Regions:
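A local structural motif
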Residues: 37-41, 62-71, 89, 193-211, ...
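Periplasmic-binding protein-like
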Residues: 119-123, 137, 169-175, 199-204, 210, 281-304, ...
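A ligand-binding cleft/hinge motif common to bilobed small-molecule-binding domains
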Residues: 98-102, 222-245
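Early extracytoplasmic/lumenal segment of secretory-pathway proteins
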Residues: 6-8, 23-103
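Extracellular/periplasmic bilobal clamshell ligand-binding domains
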Residues: 307-344
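Extracytoplasmic ligand-binding site segments that recognize negatively charged/polar headgroups
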Residues: 46-47, 52, 89-225
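A bilobed periplasmic-binding-protein/Venus flytrap-type ligand-binding module shared by bacterial periplasmic
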Residues: 142-147, 258-273, 289-290
Length: 344
């Protein structure tokens, strides 16, 4: 009896192995072929993980080059690009204009040139080719459709927004977001510290909430919980695509913007491959793929058409130079915190 049991177990094992073998062969036959990798580039960045993952996957599929993403915070990136930071291993940095200007000043970045980079407006690149802007996210006003149809459509400038009136405003707390704080930095560069503080105090009389997250003002405006939400174009476009009753308005008197760009580290021994990747980031095709994936920015490539706002107006940017230091930013935030945020 035990002999037949042994034969049965052996037979079952053989059948199981044959079944596994057939399944494994089927999986191997239908599995996607592994992409051959020609090179690997190490990229330091403080961009959101979803953006860098998307770009890395797209470039691997298209160019067979793996992007090794090294995520940092904005503050860590600033320290890395400071002149006192000597360990500059890696190939590329993807970060804000301020950090790129710091890296150029600290002599950490190589000059780079290409026909595609030559097309980019001087406003969006370094005069010596040490960095180039890829895309930018401007600050916009957002309003619920019902409020927009009544009074909101006439609030089209920063000047009007801070005047006396019955409207309510939600904006992101400058202390919680580098992107939001760029409003403060830009206004001080254009108008000076005293005039900016006075303006922010006037605007503060309308502010019902300083939000923690960037998209909160837009969400509250779209839900008609606030008349006007001050936020980024990328977030406003997201809510429009999701079908929320929200209108996006570009301030006619100019608006701050957050420029993201790229530079090649002097430590890189893959200069040609790095330039090719940055050229790819600048391409109209990459911009179109990003837009299809839901990443709504203004692209520095002049071949990519710029959108207009809900009134049909084109974007007007404040003519700022940027390059604000970490110490300068902290000082301005302290002034805003004491005199505006808690000094009403």
């Amino acid at each position: 009896m035990s002999r037949w049991r042994s034969f049965g177990l052996l037979g079952g094992f053989v059948v199981a192995m044959l079944g596994f073998g057939a399944w494994y062969s089927y999986e191997q036959l239908h599995a996607e072929p592994e992409i051959p990798v020609k090179a690997t580039l190490t990229v330091y960045t403080d961009l959101p993980n979803n953006v860098t993952s998307f770009l890395a996957d797209e470039y691997l599929n298209e160019a067979q080059v793996r992007i090794n993403v090294m995520p940092l915070t904005g503050e860590q990136m600033a320290k890395r690009l400071d002149s006192n930071y000597l360990d500059q291993r890696g190939d590329i940095v993807l970060t804000s204009k301020d950090n790129l200007m710091l890296g150029a000043k600290s002599d950490h970045l190589l000059g780079m040139y290409s026909e595609r980079m030559d097309l980019i407006a001087p406003t969006f690149k370094d005069s010596e080719g040490r960095w180039v802007g890829l895309w930018y996210d401007p600050v916009v006003f957002t309003q619920n459709t019902s409020y927009y149809n009544r009074l909101g459509q006439f609030i089209t400038t920063w000047g009007t927004l801070a005047k006396e009136g019955p409207w309510t405003v939600v904006m992101t707390d400058f202390m919680t977001s580098e992107s939001a704080a760029n409003i403060l930095h830009s206004f001080v560069e254009i108008h000076g510290e005293a005039a900016t503080v006075a303006y922010m105090k006037s605007l503060g009389t309308h502010v019902t909430q300083y939000a923690k997250y960037l998209d909160t003002p837009i969400r509250l405006a779209s839900l008609n919980e606030a008349n006007i939400g001050i936020g980024n174009y990328s977030d406003g476009s997201f809510y429009v695509r999701q079908g929320y009753p929200v209108k996006v308005i570009f301030p006619l008197d100019g608006t701050p913007y957050y420029l993201t760009g790229a530079g090649i580290l002097k430590s890189s021994n893959q200069y040609a491959e790095s330039v090719q990747f940055i050229n790819w980031l600048l391409s109209a095709k990459t911009a179109q793929e990003m837009q299809k994936a839901g990443y709504s920015y203004f692209f520095t490539n002049p071949e990519v058409k710029d959108p207009v706002d809900s009134l049909g107006h084109p974007l007007v940017l404040l003519e700022t130079q940027g390059g604000y230091t970490v110490e300068g930013k902290k000082s301005l935030l302290e002034i805003w915190l004491k005199q505006v945020r808690f000094g009403q």
